[in-house]
Amino acid sequence: MITCCNLISGCIAVTFALYGNLPMALVWIVIGALFDFFDGMTARLLHVSSSIGKELDSLADDVTFGVAPAAMVYHELTIMNYPGILEPLRPFLPYIAFVLAAFSALRLAKFNLDERQTTSFIGLPTPANALFWGSLLVGAGHMLEASPAYMPALLVMVLISCYLLVSEIPMFALKFKQWGWKGNEVRYLFLITSAILLLLFRVKGIALVIAWYIFLSAFTARKS
């Protein structure tokens, strides 16, 4: 039931995105993320799992964290200023956004089969990717639309995002086995810095938090 609420939230987010209401699309992505969190927590507390639940969860996640942010990027690419050389491709280039949905599905399929990801992640989790795109487009959309130079940069970011989703970069999870500092240094550093970024930058801060998460994960993995 909770998984279906996540799926419905994703469908609503897609609808808002395609109509150009990106703030409401982000709101429904966040609502879907909350349903996804409580769904997983409930399953762990009750010690229940099933094959159909696992498949439904992945389907819901791809809609909420794959198709919805892709639809937001699609809308942004339809209204951005294009460099003159790319203007003839305006009817076609926005559809590149939907590779985000495809790579999100691939990332979720890998996650279901990868036994290494029980206490941490390998590759960028789809909720983090969705929140990055949602907050970036809502918080900095007007800036992105101001100059044609941002349009190809956005396409490059889409490709980087797709790579991160299926990469082999280890990324930490906010799962605490105990609450002490020792062994949780990276998690506490992330949470403290994230709180500061959110206080300073509000919605745009979410994108900065995700960027910080990627950097900190990659840096930690390189040191270990």
Task: Show where each model-derived region lies.
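C-terminal membrane-associated helical module and adjoining short loops/tails
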Residues: 118-224
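Cytosolic, membrane-interface loops and tails of multi-pass inner-membrane proteins
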Residues: 39-50, 111-115, 119, 173, ...
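Hydrophobic alpha-helical transmembrane segments of polytopic
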Residues: 2-5, 25-32, 96-103, 129, ...
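Topogenic membrane-insertion module of multi-pass membrane proteins
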Residues: 1-37, 198, 208-209, 220
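Helix-coil boundary and interhelical linker segments in multi-pass alpha-helical membrane proteins
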Residues: 12-27, 69-95, 136-153, 200-203
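Alpha-helical transmembrane segments of polytopic integral membrane proteins
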Residues: 11-14, 31, 69, 102-105, ...
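Active-site His/Glu-centered metal-binding helix of metallohydrolases
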Residues: 8, 34, 38-42, 59, ...
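Multi-pass membrane catalytic core of lipid/isoprenoid biosynthesis enzymes
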Residues: 1-4, 45-109
